[in-house]
UniProtKB/Swiss-Prot annotation:
Keyword Transcription in annotation: yes
Full protein name: Protein KleB
Annotated Pfam families: DUF2688
Alphabetized InterPro entries for the sequence: DUF2688 (IPR024392)
Lineage: superkingdom: Bacteria
Feature: DNA-binding region: 9-28
Length: 71
């Protein structure tokens, strides 16, 4: 996958409309999770969604570390 520039973008929460800042793509390759839950502000995210984000981020980071170790 080619390296695309990562930018900070301002958008609105999909649930309440509050202005939020986010990254244009995931730093660690969790783009599918970012697409699904990335446009929701901290006030609107549910505990279950927060847990999915934490677990998904950890797994993506571990995959990145494992891939770096095999290079």
């Amino acid at each position: 996958m080619p390296n695309r520039k990562i930018e900070i973008v301002t958008t609105n929460c999909r649930r309440c409309g509050k202005s939020i800042s986010t990254l244009s793509r995931s730093l660690i390759g969790a783009d599918a999770l970012r697409e699904e839950l990335g446009g929701i502000c901290g006030d609107c995210i549910t505990p279950e969604e927060r847990q999915r984000i934490e677990q998904g981020t950890l797994l993506a980071a571990l995959r990145q570390c494992a891939a770096a170790g095999t290079s």
